[in-house]
């Protein structure tokens, strides 16, 4: 075992974790950025929707890193109080270590239980303000229980999926089984939109609408934060934002859910904005003030810039140039050129070779031809 500090929280963790389902105790150092973003987004949400009491559940707690950071670093009642955290895990070794870590940080606002995640969530119907599902693989086995355990208005469902190849379209049949959706291959933004769409459909049967406030595809995982909205009308509004997408040589064709599916289209995808701009701006400020990882700030800033261009999909410049057999312009030069043509453009957080823009594919191709001709 060794001791580290993550954020403002001390943790005792395994010396050599292999990061697999077979680990006796699960701690993933790569996910520090994930946890930095999580604390920042939830704190930003708390700043907007402050309460006298706030209950959070981390039902797949592992060593307790995520739940204990929530307990130690989140503030309620305008900074005078702390939330109540429930951490669960089915692994007794993980529970013992989480308890040690709670003592290490002198936390008395944490309840640590040895229990299956679905059992823990099912025993706490409509109790939690936040439920954070962070499994090894797909979140779908826990999603129904999680939705039923969250308050139906102004709660947050936080969800990680590490089966990115499934969401990314490499395993079509598995995606249909796990997410009841047909994936398009090779687009990380659409992987996020597919996960969000699945959660919206799951929540709608309980007359709960889900509205994404922040989402990202970083490293080996997809992560999303969804706010609950109460009532059949809100559920219907969320479902109406789902639809189908078709990709023809990097041009995205969109069809609404009401138009129905047809050959070549995949989905259902969430087709509206994935980001709450105000919550994200505040989260960036929080992360900077607390000296969280530079990478977490970078991800949030880029996601914020993407949110200002509210459309579906992005352009992979390398793929476009390969299709038209032209030289690849530097991304910064391409974005400047599009700006001069009157379009908005920014980098994406998930692919250094792609941009998000309100330009059409033909406009981007036109610039690439001019760039190639001048070389």
UniProtKB/Swiss-Prot annotation:
Record the organism.
Methanococcus aeolicus (strain ATCC BAA-1280 / DSM 17508 / OCM 812 / Nankai-3)
**Which ranges carry the Trm1 methyltransferase domain?**
2-368
Give the enzyme class. Answer: transferase
Q: Does the keyword ATP-binding apply?
A: no
Purpose: Dimethylates a single guanine residue at position 26 of a number of tRNAs using S-adenosyl-L-methionine as donor of the methyl groups.
Residues in a coiled coil are: none
SUPFAM superfamilies in the record:
S-adenosyl-L-methionine-dependent methyltransferases
Q: Which UniProt keywords apply?
A: Methyltransferase, RNA-binding, S-adenosyl-L-methionine, Transferase, tRNA processing, tRNA-binding
The name this protein carries in UniProt is tRNA (guanine(26)-N(2))-dimethyltransferase
- The residues that cross the membrane are none
What does the record give as the reaction this protein catalyses?
guanosine(26) in tRNA + 2 S-adenosyl-L-methionine = N(2)-dimethylguanosine(26) in tRNA + 2 S-adenosyl-L-homocysteine + 2 H(+)
Annotated family: Belongs to the class I-like SAM-binding methyltransferase superfamily. Trm1 family.
- Which GO molecular-function terms appear in the entry? tRNA (guanine(26)-N2)-dimethyltransferase activity; tRNA binding
